[in-house]
Amino acid sequence: MPGNNRNRRNNRNRKKRKQYGFYFDYTLLFVLVFIVGFGLTMIYSTSSYTAQIEEGDPEFYFRKQLIFTIIGFALMIVETKILDYHYLKNLAVVIYIGGLLCMFLLKTPLGITRNGATRWIKIPGLGQFQPAELVKIGTIAMTAFLIVKAGQNIKKFRTVIVICIIAGFAPALLVYVLSSNMSSALIVALISVVMTFVAYPGYKIYVALTGLAAVAFGAFYSWIKKMAASGNMTGKFRLNRILVWLNPEKYIDDKGYQTVQALYAIGSGGLFGKGLGKSLQKLGYIPESQNDMIFSVICEELGLFGAFCLIALFIVMLWRINHIAQNAPDLFGSMLATGVFAHIAIPVSYTHLRA
């Protein structure tokens, strides 16, 4: 009977909770709720003008984000009250393959092209969804699954390479090829690298690889600095974005416009900002101010003090996630928490550096 099966599953979950010990981090919950509430407030503040002009509704972007926020909290409640995270071990491959298949929907009529890039798909009744986000979740689950499956073989560096290729590099390549989304592709790849780095007991190879990467980065930075100083653009879109980021004033009338306007916003905010909702740069000066450049508007409205408080909240969140990863009852739980840590830390660092 379906009812009996459900009762048996609930009993198994309760037994697992007793076996491993149920722990709820209320500090993490408080910080999470505060950041989400703050994020919704700033999305409304930064997007209301643009939404009114483009959609005829100042709450358009805010409402979309609110819907997904409610869905997210509902799933969190179900996860903490009913399910046990160990079920993800059985669904890891399904989530992983599902994320990859969703990427191909970008090439169907469901794909939404905006500013020359197709990165979103339509979901009837809900709005839009970025398949790369599901790929990130699939990468976390699949990497954790493969690490647990590897057992003692995780001590072999070739096992680490295989896991990174299967769970991280291959999905990252697919994300980049199908959506031209370099930032999401890098996040997917780095999530698997961070997780395997934590799981792999050796460190000498990573030290050597880090040294080689530092030398390569130093050479590249020296070359790109000279390019930026000369003001010459290349034929490569990604390189041009780096050139503009390093020297935006040289391209203020073209590709450097958004970066310069973001710098104006940060500089004009001062220590305590102009006040919530009083940004001038969001009034059409910063394109897509509610997206990648939202941090610059936060600096303008709340000042450096508000920006540092937000960064401090993210640091507390990452600290609590790290605590959970270190004290998880098993390797799979530890790896899941590590993946979540990387999933948050990498884009947060990227967004703040970009602004």
Describe the role of every protein-language-model region.
Residues 18-31:
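N-terminal membrane topogenic signal
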Residues 21, 286, 328-329:
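Helix-boundary and loop/linker segments of multi-pass membrane transporters
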Residues 35-47:
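Alpha-helical transmembrane segments of multi-pass membrane proteins
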Residues 33, 45, 55-254, 296-353:
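Hydrophobic alpha-helical transmembrane segments of multi-pass inner membrane proteins, especially
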